[in-house]
Amino acid sequence: MKKAIYLLILCIFGLFSVYFTYAENISDISNTTSKNISSSNISHNNIIYSNINYNEILYIIVKNNTAYVKDVINGTNNPYHIKSAGIILYEKIYGYNYSNLLYRNSSNSLIFYYNFSVDKINYTINITIPQIEDYVGSLGGPIRMRIPPNNVKIIIVAENKLAETNGKYILEYNKTDKKVISLIYLDNVSSICNIYYTKFFNSSEFYGYAVANVTSITENRTSYTIKNPKGTFTFDRKYNVFVSNKTAYLKEPYLYVKLYNSTIDDIIILENNKISENSTKFMSNYLLSFIGIIIGFGIIGLAIYLSKRGRK
């Protein structure tokens, strides 16, 4: 009888171990999801949004006189963990204003609406993102009119063209002779952009950094040192460097941001070789659970074996 009680206690202990590990995993998933979708203090239908600091990148893609807009929100400061979807297809970009940008994040059913306008007058493109109050509604999930964060970055990509992430220029780049053909100045953008390293991307697999107003470039066996009035920038020798109109361009040898072809169901995946800490934690927890179950059955088997041996 005592041995049966002992075996029962072991089984209960094993079940509790599995339960607590599962509960911890669910808690981690819930916390990660809430961090990724939160941006302001709003409560509606038991939905609570907490204040977090997040970075936002707004992609504007111009292709065949059609403007595609993409939006990536990163609430974890780990962009290689984020997979987001959502663009809006506009009919034409030249000479028209556009509004009601629809943002859809398929991973957590959030839908965002922006008022957004793009127009072109004499080689100048004006981009306006007005300040809009937040609200929560229901259309397949929460709906919010969001105020764009102060650190929003804008990337404008056109066919065979590049754009600096500070949003000020569209650069037409010739890959054959590695020269910038033309610049289009973008107005009314700098006030909503943080300007750090200017990084640009396009679908022709040209991506990297740009340093404007270069005063000097020196190099050694491991790095380039580029100076301009704002400071000194050091880059690894892995970059392919070329200079045009006092701007140094450094091409990255590996893919950092993957921009797929612009379609209604387009998905942006920000990639990195690092493994998610949460994924690692989940794997370790499940491994511990598996080991615990094996040990539990081993103890039970040993107890049964010893019980039979004692009877003999």
From Swiss-Prot:
Compartments it resides in: Cell membrane
Membrane topology: Multi-pass membrane protein
One GO cellular component term: plasma membrane
Residue ranges crossing the lipid bilayer per the database entry: 4-24, 286-306
Keyword Transmembrane helix applies: yes
Keywords: Cell membrane, Membrane, Transmembrane, Transmembrane helix
Primary residence: membrane
Protein name: Uncharacterized protein MJ1290
